[in-house]
């Protein structure tokens, strides 16, 4: 089999946020904050398979918030070095980092030295009041996003703002243009626009997603804007399209659903390693398992 992407699962379902569209995040407690043991033998198998597929990027991701497990991130980075992936990314909301820089200073230095190249920051907008409603509804305010960007850049990381596009948050051309301008002003290297997944994977999110997903018309307007205002750079099959919009790298991403599945074993989308040693090619379909 051959794959386009390699994802490595960090931590547990524990997350300090309670995003209504979330796949599986739950409130941290004594049990889910305990690190799980990693099957390093099977990570090597997954890494070798990723190398055979010609994958150039490994994404450290989570069912919850990975930065709640900083030591595990460090260990993963050390074990992944032997596979020599050019790009090593961490997907996070980065809120724990923004709220406790003193704690994460040493980890960020370690991660950079151990090969982490890119941190992707999950948001729903560039506007703090909108992000607060989704990510920090029980707090007085959202984190200072421009300050976080500047802070992470100071360690040498490349950054990507990944926006989950929802109704009344990121649903118009004007909002998208404002978001792109925000990224450019703050020297963010990459932007990803990802419409919230129509095929909800958590029953509790079903009603919210139905009410807050973008319409087909809204998606088309955003796509046409990017094509008119920008230059198409890359077409990544079943992943998305990358544009240059006034000097800003912007990816219009395709959500994981039946339309991004290919039954050709030489054209699988995602190779996924779980800490218990299971290696899968589907996030939600239990039958999509290799080991």
Spans of features found by a protein language model:
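Canonical radical SAM enzyme core domain
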Residues: 29-45, 66-118, 123-130, 137-144, ...
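Hydrophobic faces of well-ordered beta-strands that scaffold small-molecule active sites
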Residues: 5-8, 58-60, 88-90, 119-121, ...
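Radical SAM enzyme [4Fe-4S]-AdoMet core and its adjacent flexible, acidic
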Residues: 31-34, 129-134, 138-143, 150-262
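Acidic (Asp/Glu)-rich catalytic clusters
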Residues: 48-52, 82, 108-115, 149-156, ...
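Short Fe-S-cluster ligation motifs
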Residues: 42-63
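Radical SAM enzyme core and accessory elements
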Residues: 1, 262-291
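Canonical Radical SAM [4Fe-4S] cluster-binding loop centered on the CxxxCxxC motif
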Residues: 1-42, 53
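Short loop/turn motifs at secondary-structure junctions
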Residues: 18, 54, 84, 115-116, ...
């Amino acid at each position: 089999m051959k794959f386009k992407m390699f994802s490595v699962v960090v931590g547990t379902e524990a997350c300090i946020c309670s995003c209504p569209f979330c796949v599986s995040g739950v409130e941290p407690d004594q049990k889910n904050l305990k690190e799980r043991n990693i099957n390093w033998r099977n990570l090597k198998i997954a890494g070798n398979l990723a190398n055979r597929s010609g994958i150039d990027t490994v994404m450290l991701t989570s069912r919850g918030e990975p930065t709640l497990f900083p030591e595990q991130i460090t260990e993963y980075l050390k074990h992944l070095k032997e596979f020599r992936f050019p790009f090593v990314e961490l997907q996070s909301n980065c809120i724990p980092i923004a709220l406790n820089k003193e704690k994460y200073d040493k980890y960020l230095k370690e991660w950079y030295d151990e090969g982490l190249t890119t941190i992707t920051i999950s948001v729903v907008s560039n506007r703090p009041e909108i992000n607060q409603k989704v990510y920090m509804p029980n707090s007085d305010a959202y984190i200072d996003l421009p300050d976080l960007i500047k802070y992470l850049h100071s360690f040498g990381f490349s950054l990507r703002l990944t926006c989950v596009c929802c109704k009344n948050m990121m649903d118009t051309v004007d909002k998208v243009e404002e978001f792109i301008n925000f990224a450019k002003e703050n020297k963010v290297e990459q932007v990803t626009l990802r419409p919230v997944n129509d095929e909800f994977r958590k029953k509790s999110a079903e009603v919210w997603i139905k009410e807050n997903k973008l319409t087909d018309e809204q998606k088309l307007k955003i796509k046409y804007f990017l094509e008119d205002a920008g230059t198409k750079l890359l077409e990544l099959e079943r992943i998305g399209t990358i544009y240059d919009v006034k000097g800003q790298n912007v990816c219009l991403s395709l959500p994981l659903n039946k339309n991004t599945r290919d039954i050709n074993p030489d054209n699988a989308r995602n190779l996924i390693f779980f800490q218990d040693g299971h290696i899968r090619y589907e996030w939600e379909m239990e039958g999509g398992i290799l080991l």
